[in-house]
Amino acid sequence: MLFRSHGHTFLVRLTVRGPIDPATGFVVDFDDVRRAWAPLHEQLDHCYLNAVPGLENPTSELLAQWIWRALQATLPGLALVEIRETGNAGVAYRE
């Protein structure tokens, strides 16, 4: 059996909603977003997504849901996870 694996490049956009903190002027500090995202990015970057637990069928929709579920506890105010495969093709996920 011949198996040809191919790679994809995705743009992941995370949207956070909430009140603006009067002391900082932020809804969320982008460094906090980066820290929450970094372990997931490291886990997903240049890997075979089918081998990632929970991503055995790594459609864009299921990838967005997987990211949401992985981030919701560490990123308060998470409102939307977007996965873009191209400039005009992508999905958005929220709960």
Where on the chain are the PLM-derived regions?
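Charge-rich, low-complexity N-terminal segments
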Residues: 3-95
